[in-house]
Amino acid sequence: MKDTIRQLIQQALTRLVTEGVLPEGLTPAIQVENARDKTHGDFASNIAMMLAKPAGMKPRDLAEKLIAALPADQQISKVEIAGPGFLNFFQNTAALAARLDAALADPEKLSVRKAGAAQRVVVDLSAPNLAKEMHVGHLRSTIIGDGVANVLEFLGDTVIRQNHVGDWGTQFGMLLAYLQEKPATSDELSDLENFYRAAKQRFDESEEFAERARGLVVKLQAGDAECLALWTRFKDISLSHCQETYERLNVKLTPADVMGESAYNDDLANVVNDLKATGLLVESNGAQCVFLEEFRTADDTPLPVIVQKAGGGYLYATTDLAAIRYRSKVLKADRVLYFVDQRQALHFQQVFEVARRAGFVHDGMQLEHMGFGTMNGADGRPFKTRDGGTVKLIDLLDEAEERAYTLVREKNPEVAEAELRSIAKAVGISAVKYADLSKHRASDYSFNFDQMLSFEGNTAPYLLYAYTRVAGVFRKLGSAFDASKGQIVLAAPQEQELAARLAQFTETLNNVAEKGTPHVLCAYLYDLAGLFSSFYENCPILGAENPDQQQSRLRLAALTGRTLKQGLDLLGLETLERM
């Protein structure tokens, strides 16, 4: 709807330029926002105040001329001037109802359409270090990236998930040396954290062991068959742990999406040679570097992008450049989204610019770092165990499920044990994910089990319950969401407010896709649940005045249920028919 209003305003501006009311050459960014007070309309624009000065007119006078120049549109019932010159647009309720009926007739997509042409989008997410088990620091990249990827796919983009795992480097020499020294069974390797800790202790305590580990790195990089076999075994076990976690989190990553650091090994020398051929490479203290004028240190000295160390080794920047080139040349990506910690912002700014100057990306290819903040404990510091260690992600999920089980059992002591466990799993995992997804990704947030498991406020339990409440209406009738007939009629204020929000699902998802911000979808669903609650309390469904009114309200409830379920599914949250 906002796009429609922007188009109407643009047509009015063009007409006023033709009439000489406005000067030529104006290219304003037309802002259309949701009106806060629905008595003043559904949408508002400050365009008259923006252009009053170049027009040499008072804002209200220009607003009057804009209204007169606006083309008629059946979706708009009227336009009014408010305050110093705001244009307030009122939706036509009959046209709005027709849009919702059309959405109900499209159960697969709910009439959601992408703003703009479909693209090939690479989503770089999760990327755990395979030398260790996944910890809480991997949660944000994994679930934020997955949520955005789901939305992009739903809108019609071709999404290529890329799990850029850390499966190479000096740490693997240490692990291989320890594996040679103490051959481990698969069961022993199942606890990667302890295995890594033991190997690290040997590395720190024994120079002979450390030297052997460094030698194994060289042999591994040279393609030694025995080293590669040990490395492959270790990598496969580690990846199986990751896959178990992904499935538990209801994340769509699969082994086929893994494209680790090692996948680019054969291209690293080519990256350096090609940078040299373009004249970008400079030797500094024996290292091969790219210096970009716009990146400088605090004391104004150039800040290099090092692609090869003096000893010949490669760095993360080299691998990232190889990955960018692969994603451009082979995957043919139009857009690449990197869901990586915000603290890596400078690294990506530099690498993206080097890739562009080196010609590693095709024209129009977008490289976007979708940075995120830190998950902190109650003390405001990075989340740790009591002894200061990293918290295993699997342990966090175990505790979430147990806490949810206790909560659900207290509320529903009569429910069978198997069903309690099933509900607790959905509630616990969803609570952890939603507590993260509902925050702006760029923000830090404090992890709090009590808050995230509450049935009040913007939480997963509240939204899951809101969905079961809608489903319960149809369960009482013994019918499904698609069983309601007739047409939607919007008479009561609560019906109109709920309908207006339902109609904004497309806009919400396009916003998430453009900015990589799942919290926008979370806020939408929370608002929608609240509006349904108000509608449910003020507009009786089962006790409606007549069959037509009941069917209309059932259709509103059905679309609310479908939208809540679809939105939660895109976030990777499992819905329940009852709680």
From Swiss-Prot:
A motif ('HIGH' region) lies at residues 128-138. GO terms for biological process: arginyl-tRNA aminoacylation. It catalyses: tRNA(Arg) + L-arginine + ATP = L-arginyl-tRNA(Arg) + AMP + diphosphate. GO terms for molecular function: arginine-tRNA ligase activity; ATP binding. Keywords: Aminoacyl-tRNA synthetase, ATP-binding, Cytoplasm, Ligase, Nucleotide-binding, Protein biosynthesis. Pfam families: Arg_tRNA_synt_N (PF03485), DALR_1 (PF05746), tRNA-synt_1d (PF00750). Its EC number is 6.1.1.19. Belongs to the class-I aminoacyl-tRNA synthetase family. This is Arginine--tRNA ligase. The lineage of its organism: Bacteria, Pseudomonadati, Pseudomonadota, Gammaproteobacteria, Pseudomonadales. The gene is argS.
